[in-house]
Amino acid sequence: MGKRAGGAAAAAAAASTSSAAGLEPAAGRGGGPRSAAAGLLGALHLVMTLVVAAARAEKEAFIQSESIIEVLRFDDGGLLQTETTLGLGSYQQKSISLYRGNCRPIRFEPPMLDFHEQPVGMPKMEKVYLHNPSSEETITLVSISATTSHFHASFFQNRKILPGGNTSFDVVFLARVVGNVENTLFINTSNHGVFTYQVFGVGVPNPYRLRPFLGARVPVNSSFSPIINIHNPHSEPLQVVEMYSSGGDLHLELPTGQQGGTRKLWEIPPYETKGVMRASFSSREADNHTAFIRIKTNASDSTEFIILPVEVEVTTAPGIYSSTEMLDFGTLRTQDLPKVLNLHLLNSGTKDVPITSVRPTPQNDAITVHFKPVTLKASESKYTKVASISFDASRAKKPSQFSGKITVKAKEKSYSKLEIPYQAEVLDGYLGFDHAATLFHIQDSPADPVERPIYLTNTFSFAILIHDVLLPEEARIMFQVHNFSQPVLILPNESGYIFTLFFMPSTSSMHIDNNILLVTNASKFHLPVRVYTGFLDYFVLPPKIEERFIDFGVLSATEASSILFAIINSNPIELAIKSWHIIGDGLSIELVATERGNRSTVIASLPELERSSLPDQSPVTLASGHFAVFRVKLTAKKLEGVHDGAIQITTDYEILTIPVKAVIAVGSLTCFPKHMVLPPSFPGKIVHQSLNIMNSFSQKVKIQQIRSLSEDVRFYYKRLRGNREDLEPGKKSKIANIYFDPGLQCGDHCYIGLPFLSKSEPKVQPGVAMQEDLWDADWDAHQSLFKAWMGIKENAGHRLNAMFEVNTDLQKNIVSKVSAELSWPSVLSSPRLLKFPLTNTNCSSEEEISLENPADVPVYVQFIPLALYSNPSVFADKLVSRFNLSKVAKLDLRTLEFQVYRNSAHPLQSPTGFTEGLSRHFILNLILKPGEKKSVKVKFTPLHNRTVSSLIIVRNNLTVMDAVMVQGQGTTENLRVAGKLPGPGSSLRFKITEALLKDCIDRLKLREPNFTLKRTFKVENTGQLEIRVETIEISGYACEGYGFKVVNCQEFALSANASRDIVILFTPDFTASRVIRELKFVTSSGSEFVFVLNASLPYHMLAACAEALPRPNWELALYIIISGVMSALFLLVIGTAYLEAQGIWEPFRRRLSFEASNPPFDVGRPFDLRRIVGISSEGNLNTLGCEHSHGRGFYSNASSRPGTGSHRQCGTSVHPHSSHGSKNSADVDNVRTRNSSSMSSRTSPQAAASQSTSKTSPLVSETAAATQGHTASRKSRGAKQGQHSSQHHSHSHSPLEQHSQPPPPVPQHQEPPPERLSPAPLTHPSHPERASTTRHSSEDSDITSLIEAMDKDFDHHDSSPLDVFTEQPPSPMSKSKGKGKSLQQRKAKPPKKQEEKEKRGKGKPQEDELKDALADDDSSSTTTETSNPDTEPLLREDTEKHKGRPAVPEKQESELSQGKPKSKKLLNAKKEIPTDVKGSSFELPYTPSLENKQRRNLPTKIPLPTTLASGSKSRNPPKTKGTNKLVENRPVALSKFLPSSQELGNTSSSEGEKDSPPPEWDAVPVHKPSSSTDSLYKLSLQTLNADIFLKQRQTSPTPASPSLPTAPCPFTSRGSYSSVVNSSGSDTKAKQTSSSKSKLTKAASLPGKNGNPTFAAVAAGYDKSPGGNGFAKISSNKSDFSSSLGISHIPVDSDGSDSSGLWSPVSNPNSPDFTPLNSFSAFGNSFNLTGAVFSKLSRSCSQSSQRSWNEFNSGPSYLWDSPATDPSPSWPASSSSPTHTATSILGNSSGLWSTTPFSSSIWSSNINSNLPFSTPTNALSSISLMGTENSAAAHTPSASGPADDLGQTYNPWRIWSPTVGRRSSDPWSNSHFPHEN
């Protein structure tokens, strides 16, 4: 109770603050006075308080709680005001017995309250006074309540009534319904019980026809929006001024939904009803909601309030809800038309609910329900129209019919039925009047005005007030209303004068049938007023054009024609047709029909009228709105000319005359065809046919018009272009084409055709469309179209007719009938059942489907197997029944054995992206142009031996779907031979018995034995298919093989169940007693049937029968031929051996005789190397220097390391065109001599050129040279790969440096060439082209070639000495690599080779050799991997001390310093690699015994160069710290040149190894240290004897040195290693000479290009030779020094000149073929000499900087030259490189001869060596030159290790020690260096 009271208070509070929603602006704009706004708000506050309280307490006691703090009373102004009072305690109902009779302790004034009649929605308030008659007791009032919502009481003014005192409270009566209302108010006191007070009231209809909105029931989150209709009961316009709403959920809106409007929206005309506002209630929470709407108008006075309660129940229960709480039909009169209201419902449940019935309860004849079953969708937010309810007031005879309920029942049982109340106010009665008073006739003659009074009779039960009389616009020209100035009241059941109607006839005859509008308080009434003429209307019926006269047109003389015409009575009175007759000859008339209707009715009934007639031709009367039809007939009677006549119809008002015209002519116009039948069509296909006219007149006829007499827009015509409009007489003329286009009427909703969207198109069409890649919805689309077609067909709408009329000047109405027919098209022109023949499972069969586009637009077609649909079973059943396909046992829904292929070879593509062809697997797209015919192939490829049936869906945008049933049977070919199935068990036996072999033991052999067995087998086709056997094979051979032969071995065919005999012969060869072979039948379909042929022979007769077999007749001839050929070959071999032996012996013999006659020097004289050095320096050192470096191509290494422990003396001055292995050594020597002479003659200028070039463009020259080197290397690579194995023994391939006469040190600051990459495992790409692959054929070849070369040496004193290489201990890499397979094969060969070379060396004067070696000292001191930088300064100092050589130029020093850091990096890289490396393909497959010995003598620490050799194998060297950045590591590029281990094995550490003759490491055996002095003595003898020989041999020109990196201190660019170490001044002249000769012609032996192996001095080059460095020539000429200088990009091959001597197998880094490795590995270690080493050198710019070599050598000092204390000579172990010194390799042209010969000879350990003089290192080079095979000797570490470690007594004569077969086993031969001289 308290809650409801609180709700009322809240409502009151809300009402007090509410605004005129939507009306406030209107009120402002409307100008309505808002008087006493505060007072109105106060009154509204009070009323709303009471109303809300009443609404909350329908059947409960109204509780006045403490929250109610307002008391209501009347003010003087008549408005309701509020005052604040004290709050009350809670209500306590006490069961105190009431006082009875006069004993009541309280008295009410008045005793009871009667409100009498009050309109609904308009409250009235009265005050009640309470008196306390007691003089002692004080009455305490607690509360007051009521049990109805119609009465509302305020609280007491005073809570306590003192004795004799009084108080008061207010009671408000707000009627909600019409009728009596009474209630009892309960007044509760604290001590005196409960007092009652009676209140009464009567509710009457609201004068504004307003009603409360009660009983609305809506679901949550929906709305209730009734329209507030206000009736204006006043005679003045009613203006709504304000309108308020009390609740927050209730707001007011304009009915139109606009935001605002003018005052006209809220102005209601007098006596009219208008909707002024929409009350919109939004239901947010489930509860009972109550609100109020306060309306104020301009007619409201101070006592009049309009308050409309709004009660809405919001619920969450699912169910059916109505949009309105009541169907209010309003006020209706009995003569009004039925009023219709629509019923809208909403389903708030979760399931769809079908509505089953809507009917009135109780049954009411006045209510008509128009309802069709409908389903309400679940959870929709919009109301759905369910039914239309109409109320017919004329049928409401009693008041019970004015109201009731509409009951809605749903199929959902859980939903209760919905009842919607309805009501209507029916006004029973009418206003009567005299009809004649409003009927006026217009005559032909002018008439006077007429005035007629109008009287009305009121039959209503209430008075009718005529407020206004309005004339329509049409009637104002003839009528006026007089005597109506003010409203007229007509009492019930009385008549009264209303106004006078003044009529002024008009001269123009016209009919007026309209209404005068009477505005009354009972709505509006229509008073009919009519003006008539009495005339009849007529018109001629179609197909005549002219309607006002009857025109027969041109008639033939024998023709009779009839025309229909109709007359219509449009007058408000009936007219009698008295008579009708004709005027004229040949005319007749008859009445056809009379009916009610208008013009349209007549035309619609034209076909029936043409056939009908009336037998009764008597006069007729036409009522108003009726018509009569007459037929006029004209008979020509063979008359010619114009015929006129008339028809007259007589009535009381007129005589109607209708003219008749006709032209009668001889002839006629006839349409051909009379009945035009168009072919079947459909939307999208337009059909047409030509219209022809036959002119039988004798004159031309002009066409005037062609038209269609039907209204069907699908029929139309087109005149032909160029057609004349004249019809020639006596001819048939084509005048037009008649078209039928079915698509013109249906538009986008035709029964055929859908838009087609390709998969690339977005679906933008709102309607149904086909999509290329979505087909599961096809059936629905097809079904909808087909249903539309069936509907048309059932209604016979598929047959259409039209009439076309042609009018001419002579004849009219030439009619042709056109018939058209609609059809259901199909794109299939072939049968829908496609049967395939029996098909082999291995094969396919094809059938065609024919397509035709019947439409005039492109049709998109897709063939889709049924299996691709998501639910094929559903589609299958529907399609089979739809297309009447033959029923099959079972459709395979998932088979893909049928596939459609396109026959067209040129696919089309539509603009939308739809392309012909297989869009995806098994789907074929086609585009059919209009009228195009295509065919597609369906291929049936059975998978199993069974019958398969399926459907192929033909998607198209014409009919959506079509289907073709495909049916095929798969089967297999079955073949039997001799009744046996194919397979292993089907043996066809051939058993040869002894009886058949009796000829084997028949010794007489009177005839040839015949062992052939013949068998006949039956071949049967047991399958269903015809088998065509194409071939018969016997174990892969056609028809015959392995003794078996098929006689009738031709192609044959076997039909089903047919058979054939084949004959197979078997002839044994008696090699086995059982022969089992395969007999294979291959069919045209690819099937193979394999049977086993099994032949058996007696085992014991095989031998005898084999002998009995006849031999072939050609056997003897073949035997004789082979024997003769073999004998000839043997003789040829013997002769060749003899010639070769002679070639080997003669040169050796001549050499021995020469040596015997020319002793080299006095043997008794001591071997003084210092003296020899002095002689060579002063005497011919210059010549030797220039000539040797150029002729032999020895490059004194820019870092000519005098102290390198094992100089890789690339000293074998191999002729660039070293002879092939097939030639003997004499040839080799000849070649060498010629080459050396030619090259020596060319190298000097080239060297000069190269020097100059190196200053300017070192890189260019390097590139050129490298290119030459690579080109040559490629030539012989293939040949060498098989012969060379990886020989990586020499860790430092330092060629013996050739010491030239030191020129003044001219430091040259040249642009530093790019540093080379330090050698990685693939350091130098082996250039097999440069290494001799052919080995010498005998061990004497060395001796003979040496003798010849020594003979020729006397003729060429300028040839450079040979570089001799001390065999160094192999690097760990070389050690491990030497363990290959070929290593074992060649282990025994080196000693013989060494002995042979020692013998060879003895024949040469030692002193000459020393001179030659001195000349080559610069190059002989090639930087070997084991060179120790720490000993180099000592050696250099020793050289200076003993020989007085100038110090190395600063530039050379800096070059050396630049070279060192890179070498250091290489060393570091080597350190990282374990020394124990497995054999690699880079090494030779064998290890010489010398090398093995030296390996055993190696210290535990392998020289860092050795480590580098192995290390370089595993990784790319680090970048150097030189001036230039390192080129990227080149192992990959190298690997291009090292495809196999043999390639790298061909390369030595020196640049020229590959191009050089066989490496000298074979020829330079290093023995265990015996006596150092003895060893050196023997060496001196050798070098002296070989001096001249070596001069002759040096042919490689000295290349120009590329410029070295610029160092802080100037030093010789590209200075040789020896120049840096020895601090010698650079030889400017030699530099220039070298530079000038930098470019050699091809005739010159170009190292690395023309076959002349370049100097392989740089230890960084990975020497593959045994004892080689293991690095393949990365540090060749250039890299030997330049790399040591840190020149990362300088090609080690040369200084850039084209001189062959400049190039090593390692091509220029700039060359396209090869990219050198990064850092220079002077000693086989990848270290950078440019960094810390040369930084010191550059700071000091003196020799002292070289003392820092140890600092950068992370390895032991024995990696470098032997210390002074090392008595053992360090033998350079350069591989098969030419004797290009390291200097020349590095391209230090200025320093080629700038330094003195090594201070300490390459074989002398130190100044303090036991030798009294320094031995020139070039002696070794000279010796090395003699080795024409492998010149890569093992590097002997000559560092601080013990002397016996690597130092060995060098016996120069052992170079020529005989090595049996050594040449032939050498991987490097001179064969690849052809002679060019």
Swiss-Prot record:
Signal peptide from the UniProt entry: 1-20
Residue spans, topological domain Cytoplasmic: 1137-1877
Domain of life per record: Eukaryota
Biased composition (Pro residues): 1301-1311, 1599-1608
Name recorded for this polypeptide: Transmembrane protein 131
Region PapD-L domain, residue ranges: 107-281
Keywords for this protein: Membrane, Phosphoprotein, Signal, Transmembrane, Transmembrane helix
Complex formation: Interacts (via PapD-L domain) with COL1A2 (via C-terminus); the interaction is direct, may occur with other collagen proteins, and is involved in assembly and TRAPPIII ER-to-Golgi transport complex-dependent secretion of collagen. Interacts (via C-terminus) with TRAPPC8 (via C-terminus); the interaction is direct.
Basic and acidic residues composition-biased segments: 1326-1339, 1349-1360, 1392-1414
SS bond partners: none
Domain remark text: Possesses a PapD-like (PapD-L) domain similar to PapD domains involved in assembly and secretion of bacterial pilus components. The PapD-L domain can bind collagens and is probably involved in collagen assembly and secretion.
InterPro entries from the UniProt entry: Ig-like_fold (IPR013783), Ig_TMEM131_2 (IPR056311), Ig_TMEM131L_3 (IPR055435), Ig_TMEM131L_4 (IPR055436), Ig_TMEM131L_5 (IPR055437), TMEM131-like (IPR039877), TMEM131-like_Ig_dom2 (IPR045695), TMEM131-like_N (IPR022113)
Membrane spanning stretches: 1116-1136
Organism per entry: Mus musculus (Mouse)
Keyword Signal: yes
Function: Collagen binding transmembrane protein involved in collagen secretion by recruiting the ER-to-Golgi transport complex TRAPPIII. May play a role in the immune response to viral infection.
Gene Ontology cellular-component annotations: membrane
